[in-house]
Amino acid sequence: MADKQTHETELTFDQVKEQLTESGKKRGVLTYEEIAERMSSFEIESDQMDEYYEFLGEQGVELISENEETEDPNIQQLAKAEEEFDLNDLSVPPGVKINDPVRMYLKEIGRVNLLSAKEEIAYAQKIEEGDEESKRRLAEANLRLVVSIAKRYVGRGMLFLDLIQEGNMGLMKAVEKFDYRKGYKFSTYATWWIRQAITRAIADQARTIRIPVHMVETINKLIRVQRQLLQDLGREPTPEEIAEDMDLTPEKVREILKIAQEPVSLETPIGEEDDSHLGDFIEDQEATSPSDHAAYELLKEQLEDVLDTLTDREENVLRLRFGLDDGRTRTLEEVGKVFGVTRERIRQIEAKALRKLRHPSRSKRLKDFLE
């Protein structure tokens, strides 16, 4: 053991990453716990770990918690998964818009008869013998279960149909791994796999900014605690109250809440007919308001009229000195070069032009814009 620890400390961070990556590629999976154990001797920023998790995902390595690593869920997990679902209810969740193909799919699976416990065992026995038809029949009879579970995850950032598709993949894994000898119902066993497939898909695909799976699990736990406290207290719980329930610091809870925030697209449809977008209703803080723009145009017109009362040279000197045409002011010397005179001469012309503009006959036309 001591030799192993000594050897571990001799490895660099990159070498440990390489070893973990190779192990993950061979097995197809790594646990967060084994990564943490191998990395414990290094000082690593959370950003570095997130980058490494993302790299592993790109390499096809699945990241899971240790309690998820077993090939099959344990008894406690199955007990937790065992819930009563209304498999005859194939209605669409409120707020979900579906098209004809989805409606046809729901109608189709509603025609498939549910299986009794004896039939499930009979099909499972045939599946062990390699009967593909039994595998298909067992899966089809439980497609309603997938829909029932998928309904509970609507509003998490994925389309209802996508949730169903991910759940169906979990169902197929359950069909492959179901062992009827252990005594539990297939629906109980399949529920665990369906949920796992859906929650992982949400973690990987639902968010614009991807969050590591372990953080998604923490966010989901926080949301559950938040809802429970809302019911108990009759108001939104404070970060301190959530922290106490989750055994975390209030600062950590605030950090998780910040991470959990979803970016909202400016193209989000608004209105019953989706004929407007969210961006249409958000003020551009840098844009000039219509009233200011109108006032500016009127001032510009009045200024042009007033400047027309000066001589051409006086008007052009003021335009250059104050940048009235292009927004760039010039020095006396720069303007002098344009007219081929000294800077002192330009100063005199400017002073004379400004005196003329201050005369009540001209200035009263501009004073209203100063109020």
Curated annotation (Swiss-Prot):
GO terms for biological process: DNA-templated transcription initiation. Sigma factors are initiation factors that promote the attachment of RNA polymerase (RNAP) to specific initiation sites and are then released. This sigma factor is the primary sigma factor during all growth phases, stress and during sporulation. It associates with the RNAP core at all growth stages with a slight increase in stationary phase. The keyword Repressor does not apply. CDD domains: Sigma70_r4. Its main location: cytoplasm. The lineage of its organism: Bacteria, Bacillati, Bacillota, Bacilli, Bacillales. This is RNA polymerase sigma factor SigA. A motif (Interaction with polymerase core subunit RpoC) lies at residues 162-165. GO terms for cellular component: cytoplasm. Induction: Association with RNAP core remains approximately constant during all stresses tested and during sporulation (at protein level). Belongs to the sigma-70 factor family. RpoD/SigA subfamily. Residues 138-208 are annotated as: Sigma-70 factor domain-2. Residues 332-351 bind DNA. The keyword DNA-binding applies. Interacts transiently with the RNAP core. Residues 217-293 are annotated as: Sigma-70 factor domain-3. A conformational change of sigma-A occurs during its association with the core enzyme. GO terms for molecular function: DNA binding; sigma factor activity.
